[in-house]
Amino acid sequence: LRETSYNKPELKTFVEDNLKKLTGEQKLAYDTVQSKIDKGEGGFIFMDAPGGTGKTFTSTVILANNRSNDKIALAVASTGIASSLLPGGTTAHRLFKLPLDLDKDEYPSCNIELGTPIARLLELCCLIVWDECTMTHKKALESVNRLLQDVRKNKRLFGGVVMLLTGDFRQTLP
C-alpha cells in the first residue's frame, strides 16, 4: 500500500527544511496536532483560514512528519482538485466509500467491511487530514465518524483518531 511505503529519509529532509518556514500560527497548529498524536489522545481539530494562508502547506508538513516516523497518516479532500494538492491525497468519497446520495438515507454508511485491507488501514492510522471540509455534507462526516468508531472499536469521536479538518468558512454560502 502507498500509505506504508513512503520514502522516509526524503520525508525527514522535507520536514527539516520546511518546519522552520512555518509561521507562528502554523507552528502552533503543527504542535497541537503532533501533541495529540504523540499522546494518543485523538481529537478533532479545525484549521480555518482564508485561502492562500498556508493551510495546505501546514498539512503537508504534518503529514510528512508522521509518515517519516512510520505512522499512517491519510489525506483526503472534498474535491478531486483539492485532493491532488495533498501528497498521497484522494477524495473522501473514494477513501471512505461514501454513498453518492447522502440525503437518500437518514443515516448513510460507508461501504467498507470490517477485516478488509482498507478497514485495517483506517484502524492503524494516527491522523486523517480532510481538506476543504467546509464543502462537505454533514452526513459524510457523521458516516465517517461511525465507520471509524466501528473499525477502531472505539466510541470516542472519530474512533479516537486525530482528525485535522481544514477549510475556509468564508467560502461557504449561508
Enumerate the language-model features and the residues they cover.
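Conserved ATP-binding/catalytic motifs of P-loop helicase motor domains
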Residues: L1-P174
